[in-house]
From Swiss-Prot:
It is found in: Cytoplasm. Keywords: Cytoplasm, Elongation factor, Protein biosynthesis. This is Elongation factor Ts. It comes from the Bacteria. The keyword Protein biosynthesis applies. Transmembrane segments: none annotated. One of its GO terms (molecular function) is translation elongation factor activity. Associates with the EF-Tu.GDP complex and induces the exchange of GDP to GTP. It remains bound to the aminoacyl-tRNA.EF-Tu.GTP complex up to the GTP hydrolysis stage on the ribosome. The keyword Isomerase does not apply. It comes from Salinispora tropica (strain ATCC BAA-916 / DSM 44818 / JCM 13857 / NBRC 105044 / CNB-440). Coiled coil: none annotated. It holds the Pfam family EF_TS.
């Protein structure tokens, strides 16, 4: 007897983009464990499962003020582009940038002109007629470059990036840092450097790479080299400094930054509809 329901299958399909039968088989093999089911789908070759697994169903926008970034969600893109929704997001991010808050939870617990931010959002939700959610808020210190990206001209920004950097802080340095912010927006790195990747994530990638190679009937003697190559490919996909630069794809980002005299120390990337 299976230990999952049709709703579980749908959830896994929505999460990964895999087909119904593949999702059912993966859940069966994983005994209902979602994380294991995602691994099973990756080993079986489901395309882009790792990249799709962070998606959530939401509309909204990303707003910024100075060194702060905020994601405010709504139910439809119609509301996302209304003046009142855009103004609310801007009011909240400016308030967050001015005060000492550093997270969405702290921002929700703060007050604007004597009124709680959570209450303010609820009032606007009632006026607009849709559920509104303050999903994320972040703020960086030091020298920061900002980039916002619109997915459609008639919609507000859906992707926002903050890049904290040192080294050259003149106009040329700022241009280089903003170029990195554009890279982050487009290429979706999850980590700054290899050192930031948790050991359990690297181990999971090694396990998946080995299982996949065995499924492909690769020679046993070749497995270590194949696994190492696939783990390195993971780093090149998801680690910013290891990615090929969008300005010069023959060089990794770390080399381009070193040549420019810029060191990225931290970044934040928000995208509407992504976890």
């Amino acid at each position: 007897m299976s230990n999952f329901t049709a709703a579980d299958v749908k959830k896994l399909r929505d999460l990964t983009g895999a087909g119904m039968m593949d999702s059912k088989k993966a859940l069966t093999e994983a005994e209902g464990d979602f994380d294991k089911a995602v691994e099973v789908l990756r080993v079986k070759g489901a395309k882009d499962v790792g990249k799709r697994a962070g998606r959530t169903a939401a509309n909204g926008l990303v707003a910024h003020s100075g060194k702060a970034l905020l994601e405010l969600n709504c139910e439809t893109d119609f509301v996302a582009k209304t003046d009142s929704f855009v103004a609310l997001a801007q009011q909240l991010v400016e308030h967050g940038e001015r005060t000492g808050v550093n997270s969405a939870e702290e921002l929700l617990a703060s007050e604007i002109d004597g009124k709680g931010v959570a209450e303010l959002i609820q009032e606007q939700s009632a006026k607009i007629g849709e559920k509104l959610v303050l999903n994320r808020f972040a703020k960086l210190d030091g020298t920061v470059a900002v980039y916002l990206h619109r997915k459609a001209q008639d919609l507000p920004p859906a992707v926002g990036v903050l890049v904290q950097y040192t080294g050259r802080t003149d106009e040329a340095g700022d241009a280089d840092a903003r170029g990195v912010a554009m890279q982050i927006a487009a290429m979706r790195p999850q980590y700054l450097s290899r050192d930031e990747v948790p050991a359990e994530v690297v181990e999971s990638e090694r396990r998946i790479a080995e299982q996949t190679a065995r499924e492909e009937n690769k020679p046993e003697a070749a497995l270590p080299k194949i696994v190492e190559g696939r783990v390195n490919s993971f780093f090149k996909d998801f680690v910013l400094l290891e990615q090929a630069s969008v300005t010069d794809n023959k060089k990794p980002v770390r080399q381009v930054l070193a040549e420019a005299g810029v060191e990225v120390t931290r970044f934040v990337r928000f995208e509407v509809g992504q976890a």
